[in-house]
């Protein structure tokens, strides 16, 4: 996976051979860190894969071998580690919620082509914006959440107070949790 993302020259000591990769020490350390982070959740990979399947009109994941789906989820999850994606995330997080509304709208208009990351109390979660509607000072973003794939959830942004709220519900309507934040620093929008 790391060779796919960063290239053999960045990962292996034996760049000029066709032998199995002998990883650089830094690559081994990164792989360990990578595995630890991957163990905490794969929502980014699930979100990106869902967007790709939707955009490309591909075969639904339920009709593909589990190993192939898992490999794709891990790959797309790992892309958030790429320097260009990490830089976009940092830039996006520096903006107020109201400043992200247009980027969210562009992703929705293009056919669900951006991820929306939310950060709250040292946790993070990624969802796929699929609709957007302005209601006065509030913007209601309909999202696909891989934790509740059968139903559309909503994230609400108050453009006046700069507060966003995400309270996903289960099939019975029970609120699973509530995340809320005021100001910049806790949302990112990453175009695919």
Predicted regions and their residues:
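Conserved active-site-adjacent core of cysteine acyl-enzyme catalytic domains
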Residues: 45, 49-124, 146
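Residues in intrinsically disordered, low-complexity segments of regulatory proteins
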Residues: 5, 75-76, 163, 178
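Conserved hydrophobic positions within beta-strands
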Residues: 129-131
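Active-site-adjacent structural segments surrounding the nucleophilic cysteine of cysteine proteases
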Residues: 1-70
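Cys-His-centered catalytic/binding microenvironment captured across papain-like cysteine peptidases
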Residues: 121-124, 133-192
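Residue-level detector of short, conserved catalytic/binding motifs and their immediate flanks
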Residues: 41, 114, 125-127, 139
